[in-house]
């Protein structure tokens, strides 16, 4: 299975002056933990990291944590563009791909394996977790307008798995129609293509804020 790790973000929401994936959590950069988990997944036999040129040397120094060769891919100005560049860089024999946020450093190797297995057996799939909070929809003034049925709500995570040809087609359609999406599953949704969820549990968090770093450090300290 081919894996693309999206690592071209910034530390803006973290309040940091550099890519958040290079910030330390429990003694290692965030990306190091993500690479270690990916490398420990038996299903993963090719890894590409999509990042910005200014982070290349710092990230390349972490590739050994994967325990297998890692391909560097220069990202674009948005996540959407970066993933499209990642798809272009895949080996010619790639038929399926998992896309994973580098900031989800608590991901367990078995989550990669389960997503890979589900993808090969039944088509597009994403890691997710059922929403436990009551969600409110509000208007521009902050007034509640609706309370969606919680039993139908899942929080999307990564990895997200797709057919390479279908995901490339999805990105081509997005470019042609000027669609802007925050994850790849949204492309399939807009095109009416089915995507299933795989329960990865609530621990597969995305490290985005200083609080997330604290939580991640506590979890890693207990492993």
UniProtKB/Swiss-Prot annotation:
The biological process GO terms on file are: isopentenyl diphosphate biosynthetic process, methylerythritol 4-phosphate pathway
Q: Which UniProt keywords apply?
A: Isoprene biosynthesis, Nucleotidyltransferase, Transferase
For the protein in the UniProt heading, the enzyme class is transferase
Q: Name one GO molecular function term.
A: 2-C-methyl-D-erythritol 4-phosphate cytidylyltransferase activity
Q: Where is this site: Transition state stabilizer?
A: 13, 20
Quote the pathway field: Isoprenoid biosynthesis; isopentenyl diphosphate biosynthesis via DXP pathway; isopentenyl diphosphate from 1-deoxy-D-xylulose 5-phosphate: step 2/6
Residues folding into a coiled coil are none
Q: Give the Pfam families listed for this entry.
A: IspD (PF01128)
Domain of life, per lineage:
Bacteria
Known EC number: 2.7.7.60
| Annotated site residues (Positions MEP for the nucleophilic attack) in this chain | 150, 206
Per its record, the protein catalyses: 2-C-methyl-D-erythritol 4-phosphate + CTP + H(+) = 4-CDP-2-C-methyl-D-erythritol + diphosphate
Known role: Catalyzes the formation of 4-diphosphocytidyl-2-C-methyl-D-erythritol from CTP and 2-C-methyl-D-erythritol 4-phosphate (MEP).
Q: Which family does it belong to?
A: Belongs to the IspD/TarI cytidylyltransferase family. IspD subfamily.
Entry protein name: 2-C-methyl-D-erythritol 4-phosphate cytidylyltransferase
Species of the source = Synechococcus sp. (strain WH7803)
């Amino acid at each position: 299975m081919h894996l693309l790790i999206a690592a071209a973000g910034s530390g803006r929401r973290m309040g940091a002056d550099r890519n958040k994936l290079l910030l330390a959590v429990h003694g290692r950069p965030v990306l190091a933990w993500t690479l270690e988990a990916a490398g420990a997944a038996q299903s993963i036999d090719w890894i590409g990291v999509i990042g910005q040129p200014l982070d290349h040397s710092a990230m390349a120094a972490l590739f050994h944590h994967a325990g297998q060769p890692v391909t560097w891919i220069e990202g674009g100005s948005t996540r959407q563009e970066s993933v499209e560049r990642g798809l272009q860089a895949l080996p010619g024999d790639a038929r399926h791909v998992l896309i994973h946020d580098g900031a989800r450093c608590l991901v367990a190797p078995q989550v990669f394996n389960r997503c890979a297995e589900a993808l090969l057996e039944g088509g597009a799939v994403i890691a997710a977790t059922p929403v436990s909070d009551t969600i409110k929809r509000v208007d521009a003034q902050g007034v509640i307008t609706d309370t969606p049925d919680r039993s139908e709500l899942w929080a999307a995570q990564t990895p997200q798995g797709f057919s390479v040809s279908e995901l490339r087609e999805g990105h081509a359609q997005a470019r042609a129609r000027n669609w802007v999406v925050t994850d790849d599953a949204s492309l399939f949704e807009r095109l009416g293509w089915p995507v299933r969820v795989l329960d990865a549990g609530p621990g597969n968090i995305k490290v985005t804020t200083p609080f997330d770093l604290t939580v991640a450090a506590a979890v890693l300290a207990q492993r």
